[in-house]
Amino acid sequence: MKDGAAGSLNGIERRGLMFVLSSPSGAGKTTLSRMLVDEAPGLRMSVSATTRPKRPGEVDGRDYYFVDRPKFDAMVEAGEFLEWANVFDNCYGTPRAPVEAALSAGNDVLFDIDWQGTQQLRSRASNDVVSVFILPPSVQDLEHRLHTRAQDSDEVIRGRMKKAGDEMSHFDAYDYIVVNDNIGVAFESVKAILRAEQLKRERQIGIDAFVREMRRELEK
């Protein structure tokens, strides 16, 4: 259940942050992202633009902005993305305008992106980025999850498994590591990370005024 006002904690104004979840395909970042958005107050999911085909049940503008390759290339050329990458022959990118609007309003923005996108975000706004890398408990478990979700062909799954090793090699570029052996436990870990980062003094931009007012009252 969400509660509290966006842009504040205990009535203290704060700056929004960009919260990144990355993982090899099948390790659970998308499930964790949805759980976090459902429960964390003031957290909004960043909606990426993509050139990949729409999957059953997906809605344009909610899950992704589905665009063709010429449109995507034009957006890159115009500098409309905070980050973008080519993944499995499809392009993904984060539109700049809605993210900047959310942060300026004091909302947190959640990113379900790969390590390349994370590095691009850091290069543009390092102080506002908090990154978490999700690992599977084993290679066997990862492969089992990819087969169980029945979204991809065997050939695509082999490609995802091959890429997983490269993605895992960048774990040390992240602030936090969570092993997803149990989705409930992993979720509690990720939620605790978000809460701790929200409470950091430097993000509570209204804390000086809050303390000054209490001191003023004590001095009466």
From Swiss-Prot:
Q: Which UniProt keywords apply?
A: ATP-binding, Cytoplasm, Kinase, Nucleotide-binding, Transferase
Keyword Lipid biosynthesis listed: no
Give any GO molecular function from the UniProt entry.
Answer: guanylate kinase activity
Mostly located where? cytoplasm
Give start and end of each Guanylate kinase-like domain: 16-195
Superkingdom assignment: Bacteria
E.C. number: 2.7.4.8
Looking up Pfam families in the UniProt record yields: Guanylate_kin
GO annotations of cellular component type: cytosol
Q: InterPro entries this protein is in?
A: GK/Ca_channel_bsu, Guanylate_kin-like_dom, Guanylate_kinase, Guanylate_kinase_CS, P-loop_NTPase
**Coiled coil stretches, renumbered:** none
**Localization in the cell:** Cytoplasm
**Does the keyword field hold ATP-binding?**
yes
Which positions in this protein are listed as binding ATP?
Answer: S23, P24, S25, G26, A27, G28, K29, T30
Query: What is the reaction catalyzed?
Result: GMP + ATP = GDP + ADP
Which family does the record assign? Belongs to the guanylate kinase family.
Q: What does this protein do?
A: Essential for recycling GMP and indirectly, cGMP.
How is this protein named in the record?
A: Guanylate kinase
Its ancestry begins with: Bacteria, Pseudomonadati, Pseudomonadota, Alphaproteobacteria, Hyphomicrobiales
Give the gene name.
gmk
